Curated annotation (Swiss-Prot):
Naturally occurring in which organism (per UniProt): Aeromonas salmonicida (strain A449)
GO molecular function: DNA binding
InterPro entries, sorted: SfsA (IPR005224), SfsA_C (IPR040452), SfsA_N (IPR041465)
Protein name per its UniProtKB record: Sugar fermentation stimulation protein homolog
Pfam family, one: SfsA_N
Protein family per UniProt: Belongs to the SfsA family.
Gene: sfsA
Segments crossing the lipid bilayer: none
Length: 247
């Protein structure tokens, strides 16, 4: 995925009301740009952070600029636009770059599924094999207090993410393939695990989903201010939080 037109940069002043971000440009001008990320954005949104933003030519948009990339104090690039996770995942699947998700004839998006009025991010289909339901999650939280390069998801309590795990388990029980695909959009993350210290319920559901046969994949594209392209899978470390006797 190439950023076209090229991204512009500035310095973060503040993020507020979840979706708004004030940025000071190099010429001193201050602009307000849209932030698509509703999470805590820990380590991504500190005042003074160098940021890059895209510009839309859609005249109907109230805010034409969107926050795309942040640069951490350590020099890591972080894609904070959560919509990009689905976009790059789809592109990589169509390119055949995600080996476990190849071999399907059709790819559809936002298809209704499950028992809780959900829509699947990506649905892979092919004659003669089970459908493959893929939920995509964007990972940007780096916390190196326990291990260098350790990433976590979620960065805030996520009822929506819990619902998606339940839906994936329903699909697996119905005989389909169910995949939770973590798109790791922080260049400093080299391994990841569930954030039990932030959302223990979600971590428990991950353990239940693994036991039920849901596949967990963690893919880290190369994140830069010009493009995001294929790179590598990284390890996922389970927390083993299931209480004794849980199913």
């Amino acid at each position: 995925m190439i950023f076209d037109p090229p991204l512009q940069s500035g310095q973060l002043i503040s993020r507020y009301k979840r979706f708004l971000t004030d940025v000071r440009l190099d010429n001193g001008e201050v602009i307000t740009i849209h932030c698509a990320n509703t999470g805590a954005m820990t380590g991504c949104a500190d005042p003074g952070t160098r940021v890059w933003y895209s510009t839309s030519d859609n005249p109907k948009r109230k805010l034409p600029h969107s926050w795309e990339i942040a640069e951490s104090p350590a020099g890591h690039f972080i894609c904070v636009n959560t919509a990009r996770a689905n976009q790059i995942a789809r592109e990589l699947i169509e390119q055949g770059a995600l080996a476990p998700l190849t071999g399907y004839a059709r790819l559809r998006t936002e298809v209704k599924y499950g028992e809780e009025n959900s829509r699947i991010d990506l649905l892979l289909e092919d004659d003669g094999k089970p459908d493959c339901y893929i939920e995509v999650k964007s990972v940007t939280l780096l916390d190196e207090r326990e291990q260098p390069g350790m990433g976590y998801f979620p960065d805030a309590v996520t009822a929506r993410g819990a619902k998606h795990l339940r839906e994936l388990m329903v699909m697996k029980a119905a005989g389909h393939r169910a995949v939770l695909l973590f798109m790791v959009l922080h260049s400093g993350i080299v391994r990841m695990r569930p954030a039990a210290h932030i959302d223990p319920h979600y971590s428990l559901l991950i353990e239940q989903a693994i036991t039920a046969g849901v596949e967990i994949l963690c893919y880290r594209p190369h994140v830069g201010v010009q493009s995001m392209v294929a790179q590598d899978f990284i390890p996922f470390e389970s927390c083993h939080l299931l209480p004794e006797g849980s199913e």
